[in-house]
């Protein structure tokens, strides 16, 4: 018989799997680990809109820095 902890872990995996499917449909380019981290941050009180803004800014900066490296 699975323990309550195992059941919680399985339920969490299923939630992340569903979120990953939605994420893929929306072309967010977030993997399961990144989604899991985002969920944890939101559960701990981080504003989801602020988190989305930070992710977009980090991606923008990353693509700009890759452009600089590739252009040299």
UniProtKB/Swiss-Prot annotation:
Function comment: Required for gamma-tubulin complex recruitment to the microtubule organizing center (MTOC).
Record text on subunit structure and interactions: Part of the gamma-tubulin complex.
Name this protein carries in UniProt: Mitotic-spindle organizing protein 1
InterPro entries the UniProt entry points to: MZT1
Gene Ontology annotations for the cellular component aspect, listed alphabetically: cytoplasm; gamma-tubulin ring complex; interphase microtubule organizing center; mitotic spindle pole body; spindle
Places the protein is found: Cytoplasm, Cytoskeleton, Microtubule organizing center, Spindle pole body
Family classification: Belongs to the MOZART1 family.
Any Pfam family matching the protein: MOZART1
GO biological process entries: gamma-tubulin complex localization; microtubule nucleation by interphase microtubule organizing center; mitotic spindle assembly
Keyword vocabulary terms for this entry: Cytoplasm, Cytoskeleton
Chief localization: cytoplasm
